[in-house]
Amino acid sequence: MLVTLEGLDGSGKTTVWERLRSDDAVPSETVFTREPTDTWYGDAVQRSIDNDDADSLAELFLYTADHAAHLSETVRPALNEGRLVVSDRYSDSRYAYQGATLAGSGTFDDPLSYVREVHAPWTRPPDRTVYLDLDPETAARRSGATNKFETAEYLTTVRDNYERLIEADPERFVRVDATADPDTVYERVRAAILD
């Protein structure tokens, strides 16, 4: 089973992911992973994040290459072994974030749909996605707005994209209010994964 943690920067995904890694109730053979990865593909993605002038289409394909390698090297092998995979960010992040970035380019009528179409023939959709829901202003404040992906204006478009994804596949998504206290958020995410 592939479970993904999604949400705006500052929503608490990584904090929850770290807590799950040390939770004795989570099966010991669980594979914990994340995107961008720690590979050279992920390093290229990180360089693009840090570059305010990165071309949005080129950036999409860096993320896509990282995702393809992640699937072939980590996700699919673990799933083939029958293991639970929990990923801190996955394809929905790319759809939401790169869809928002491409929206600013004026090149695409529906950037979110374009990004999904690029992935449709080969990606492995999650079985369940836990979406940590947070308003863009709080997300920008929590994340420190240190790069181009963390401003409230940009995160508003990202959140709108996540809402479109949830509307298109409501059975897969579990929405968790990320404004709740951290222990409550964790327990809700944990229940969504283990129940």
Curated annotation (Swiss-Prot):
It catalyses: dTMP + ATP = dTDP + ADP. It comes from the Archaea. InterPro entries: P-loop_NTPase, Thymidylate_kin-like_dom, Thymidylate_kinase. One of its GO terms (biological process) is dTTP biosynthetic process. GO terms for cellular component: cytoplasm. CDD domains: TMPK. Its EC number is 2.7.4.9. It holds the Pfam family Thymidylate_kin. ATP binds at residues 7-14. It is an enzyme of class 2 (transferase). One of its GO terms (molecular function) is ATP binding. Keywords: ATP-binding, Kinase, Nucleotide biosynthesis, Nucleotide-binding, Transferase. Belongs to the thymidylate kinase family. NCBIfam families: DTMP_kinase. This is Probable thymidylate kinase. It comes from Haloarcula marismortui (strain ATCC 43049 / DSM 3752 / JCM 8966 / VKM B-1809). The gene is tmk.
